[in-house]
């Protein structure tokens, strides 16, 4: 019974990886919309774009690690 609950928890934690993909899409889409409105400011905002993508991906990686821990360590 406990192993089954760990697998369910791992599946729920893996949803965070999909949510990270949605977050990266939102960050990149909003950057593209802003760059199309004001192309001269796009070059100065590229670093902010990569920082936002890195934070969104980090959350996805943490969710993936939690899923792995629940699958194999519990």
Curated annotation (Swiss-Prot):
InterPro entries, per the entry? ATP_synth_F0_csu (IPR000454), ATP_synth_F0_csu_sf (IPR038662), ATPase_proteolipid_c-like_dom (IPR002379), F/V-ATP_Csub_sf (IPR035921)
> What does the record say about its membrane topology?
Multi-pass membrane protein
GO cellular component entries: plasma membrane; proton-transporting ATP synthase complex; proton-transporting two-sector ATPase complex, proton-transporting domain
Q: What parts of the sequence cross the membrane?
A: 5-25, 49-69
Record has Amino-acid biosynthesis as a keyword:
no
Q: Which UniProt keywords apply?
A: ATP synthesis, Cell inner membrane, Cell membrane, CF(0), Hydrogen ion transport, Ion transport, Lipid-binding, Membrane, Transmembrane, Transmembrane helix, Transport
Name the Gene Ontology molecular function terms of this record: lipid binding; proton-transporting ATP synthase activity, rotational mechanism
Q: Which residues constitute the signal peptide according to the record?
A: none
Looking up SUPFAM superfamilies in the UniProt record yields: F1F0 ATP synthase subunit C
The site feature described as Reversibly protonated during proton transport is recorded at 57
Q: Where in the cell is it found?
A: Cell inner membrane
User: Could you describe the subunit structure of this protein?
Assistant: F-type ATPases have 2 components, F(1) - the catalytic core - and F(0) - the membrane proton channel. F(1) has five subunits: alpha(3), beta(3), gamma(1), delta(1), epsilon(1). F(0) has three main subunits: a(1), b(2) and c(10-14). The alpha and beta chains form an alternating ring which encloses part of the gamma chain. F(1) is attached to F(0) by a central stalk formed by the gamma and epsilon chains, while a peripheral stalk is formed by the delta and b chains.
Similarity section: Belongs to the ATPase C chain family.
- Which HAMAP family does this UniProt record tie to the protein? ATP_synth_c_bact (MF_01396)
What is the annotated role of this protein in its UniProt record? F(1)F(0) ATP synthase produces ATP from ADP in the presence of a proton or sodium gradient. F-type ATPases consist of two structural domains, F(1) containing the extramembraneous catalytic core and F(0) containing the membrane proton channel, linked together by a central stalk and a peripheral stalk. During catalysis, ATP synthesis in the catalytic domain of F(1) is coupled via a rotary mechanism of the central stalk subunits to proton translocation. Key component of the F(0) channel; it plays a direct role in translocation across the membrane. A homomeric c-ring of between 10-14 subunits forms the central stalk rotor element with the F(1) delta and epsilon subunits.
Q: NCBIfam families under this entry?
A: PRK07558.1
Protein name from the UniProt record: ATP synthase subunit c
What species does this protein belong to?
Answer: Ruegeria pomeroyi (strain ATCC 700808 / DSM 15171 / DSS-3) (Silicibacter pomeroyi)
